Amino acid sequence: MLVCVLLYSFRLFGIQGEAQLTESGGDLVHLEGPLRLSCAASWFTFSIYEIHWVCQASGKGLEWVAVIWRGESHQYNADYVRGRLTTSRDNTKYMLYMQMISLRTQNMAAFNCAG
């Protein structure tokens, strides 16, 4: 099982925090089909933080997938998902979105977001 964890960082204070996140999407999808996830954040000032996606396959360590900065146009994805993964955010709605296209066997898993 591959679990995606939504992380955020407090750059100003140099500490990590926890957010309340509600995920949707992530139902079973077919290979070659798109995977769409969304996370709703609450209680922290979402718009001023960069947001990371980190995944962990069963029995393996954490693996960084993507980051999206405060501005939607600034994002960076890991090489193995580049060109297939898009992240976006709506700061006014405290929402983060991720979509992966052209799923491969190694991508087939349950994705969740958590704080």
Curated annotation (Swiss-Prot):
Residues 76-113 are annotated as: Framework-3. GO terms for cellular component: extracellular region; immunoglobulin complex; plasma membrane. Residues 114-115 are annotated as: Complementarity-determining-3. Residues 43-50 are annotated as: Complementarity-determining-1. It comes from the Eukaryota. One of its GO terms (biological process) is immunoglobulin mediated immune response. This is Probable non-functional immunoglobulin heavy variable 8-51-1. The gene is IGHV8-51-1.
